[in-house]
Amino acid sequence: MLRRADGIAEAVDADYGGRCVEETLLAEVMLVVEAARHARGRLRRWARPRRVPAPVAFRPVRASVEPVPKGVVGIMAPWNYPVQLALLPAVD
């Protein structure tokens, strides 16, 4: 995304008819890039199974939560910040 940041900013500028390139780079591109870096650094921890307390009625069982991929996700994004509002939910 960083390699294509200038092209993204130009496309958003063309769509809006004069949006500031710096605003697009800071408010959209860099925000998504930083969110992706944050998620990438924590992905192993988030994806590993973890133990959770079992209800008293079911003891002595052990309970755990095992995260699974979501699969295909549809995102409906508003128009005001198209890159950020479309990609941040995918990163989260």
What does each model-identified segment do?
Residues 53-92:
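Conserved small-residue-rich beta-alpha loop and adjacent elements
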Residues 1-64:
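N-terminal Rossmann-like NAD(P)+-binding subdomain of aldehyde/semialdehyde dehydrogenases
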